[in-house]
């Protein structure tokens, strides 16, 4: 390899399962449930790394070995070639995972989805309250002869 190319093979690998609060430790979660987030994806993790000013690369074609249905992973550079930290606030893999798990719930795409879901839930409630109540009783059934 010449000096112009970047070797991402030495970067830290983060699978979304590592910070997923829905998974158990046996299924691959690496941080505590209280510090993890719900169902993160590779794009959100990569955006959080950019926010932390860490270079990252998304590998969509890779799958998590324990559960091959979990597709995608992110490679993140924590240290330079000489061993110095790129972001002094993040010193280890575990600390990086905790920081990413803090940022994922505040990701703009996730916030938009949550607002859309809230609007959908409020819309049917408004329509049901304006419509009249039904006079039919709830208990029916087959009549005996």
Swiss-Prot record:
Sequence ranges of Low complexity compositional bias: 124-137
GO biological process: SRP-dependent cotranslational protein targeting to membrane
Protein name as it appears in the record: Signal recognition particle 19 kDa protein
Annotated Gene Ontology cellular component terms: nucleolus; nucleus; signal recognition particle, endoplasmic reticulum targeting
Location in or out of the cell: Cytoplasm; Nucleus, Nucleolus
Gene coding for it: SRP19
Keywords noted in UniProt: Acetylation, Cytoplasm, Nucleus, Ribonucleoprotein, RNA-binding, Signal recognition particle
Skewed-composition ranges (Basic and acidic residues): 104-123
Residues that bear N-acetylmethionine: 1
Pfam families linked to this entry: SRP19
DNA-binding recorded as keyword: no
Assigned protein family: Belongs to the SRP19 family.
InterPro entries: Signal_recog_particle_SRP19 (IPR002778), SRP19-like_sf (IPR036521)
Function, in words: Component of the signal recognition particle (SRP) complex, a ribonucleoprotein complex that mediates the cotranslational targeting of secretory and membrane proteins to the endoplasmic reticulum (ER). Binds directly to 7SL RNA. Mediates binding of SRP54 to the SRP complex.
GO molecular function, one term: 7S RNA binding
